Amino acid sequence: MEEIQRYLQLERSQQQHHFLYPLIFQEYIYVFAHDRGFSRSILSENRGYDNKSSFLLVKRLITRMYQQNHXIIFSNDSNQNLFWGRNKNLYSQILSEGFSFILEIPFSLRLISYLEGKKKKIVKSQNLRSIHSTFPFLEDNFSHLNFLLDILIPHSVHAEILVQTLRYWLKDASSLHLLRFFLNEYCNWNRLITPKKASSSFSKRNQRLFLFLYNYHVCEYESIFVFLRNQSSHLRSTSSGVFLERIYFYGKVERLVNVFGKVKDFQENLWLVKEPCMHYVRYQRKSXLASKGTSLLMNKWKCYLVTFWQWYFSLWFHPRRIYINQLSNHSLEFLGYLASVRMNPSVVRSQILENSFLINNAIKKFDTLVPIIPLIASLAKAKFCNLLGHPISKPVWXDLSDSNIIDRFGRICRNLSHYHSGSSKKKSLYRIKYILRFSCAXTLARKHKSTVRAFLKKLGSELLQEFLMSEEDVLSLTFPKASSTLRGVYSSRIWYLDIICINDLANLK
């Protein structure tokens, strides 16, 4: 760690380009990356890993990489590749750990230098990491807007384009050249940045490099919004990220000015996309750009974004990845919710002297609903019910103790209720609780070779109260001193600031 700090101080003091290639041959880099815990469980499966991850091994790997025939290195048949041999998984794991740790250094330096130059301080708050912190932003702003650009960030990009993009940030040809060799070993780039298509073995072995490259790729697409935000002071944006998003929002404006300077008549055509009220939010590959303008303005935005991304990344960006929807009659699938802006009618009685009359007012309200059909599909995939939503037993858990079975069902139920506490209509969650309740009862009845009715009649319904805890009980336990003042609050929307990931029903032990 001291070696890294000395290197960073030397790099920052000299203010030179980031020559990271010598760090690849430093053993403490791999030890430090290993101790970060990104793949600790997988690394522990290889006995003697710390002995294998040495300076001599890394140097030998890189030397052999450059000496190999290009026809062998770029071969599609991984079994015929003589470079990796039998230890392909271990070698790629070692190099990916080193790459991921070393590539983060210039981004950290840029962030530190910007903060020192601007003398700004970032408020460190874990609450800003919560997924639920995005919804108050949507409530405050989206209810006043009209149109929405529903954007799906593309994932298909060639490895060479990524390396060329990294050259804007990283001025080290040797490191980029070695990274190009490593990426070409996995010639299918979709496997690198598409979580659904990535093989489990690759994503586990290269999880840190996987996340870094994916976030970098996504942030490159977001770079256009950073530039336009400085052109129009009313362009407001937020992003549900921690590391790379801050760097791009702080330090990428200068390079974007140079990049956009190459586009002919860019400044003259900027008025086409200027809008006094624009809001942008993104989570993973799903992003939304809302506006108070007209349909014509949103079509100009769509055309502009497609043209820019095609020119900047040198790839085909299909216009159908951007949908123009009207917020008043469209529901946005975002972060496990169905969000929409609906008209909330309100009748006010007014009386002047002896005359009284009614005034009908329609107020726009941001509405969030629980997507019941996708939730039932997730429960069916996890074998808690069938596709029609009828509860079934969980035979995989039949060998566990009764208390362990009830605890697992209760934890799933509480997590779902906790995450969907921001729903406008919580009655839809009753069906989910019903499925989990009777699935738990069916599992226990099957274990004891009895029927569900006889099992509940024998043991009583109190056995299942643990995972049927209501939101009011959760608030009472969370705020015991203010339990009397919180009556009725549980019926409204509640956003928790301790949720950092979407509940995955398939990720069960």
Swiss-Prot record:
One of its GO terms (cellular component) is chloroplast. GO terms for molecular function: RNA binding. Pfam families: Intron_maturas2, MatK_N. The keyword Chloroplast applies. It is found in: Plastid, Chloroplast. One of its GO terms (biological process) is mRNA processing. Keywords: Chloroplast, mRNA processing, Plastid, RNA-binding, tRNA processing. InterPro entries: Domain_X, Maturase_MatK, Maturase_MatK_N. Disulfide bonds: none annotated. The keyword tRNA processing applies. Its main location: plastid. Usually encoded in the trnK tRNA gene intron. Probably assists in splicing its own and other chloroplast group II introns. PANTHER family: MATURASE K. Belongs to the intron maturase 2 family. MatK subfamily. This is Maturase K. It comes from Verbascum thapsus. The lineage of its organism: Eukaryota, Viridiplantae, Streptophyta, Embryophyta, Tracheophyta.
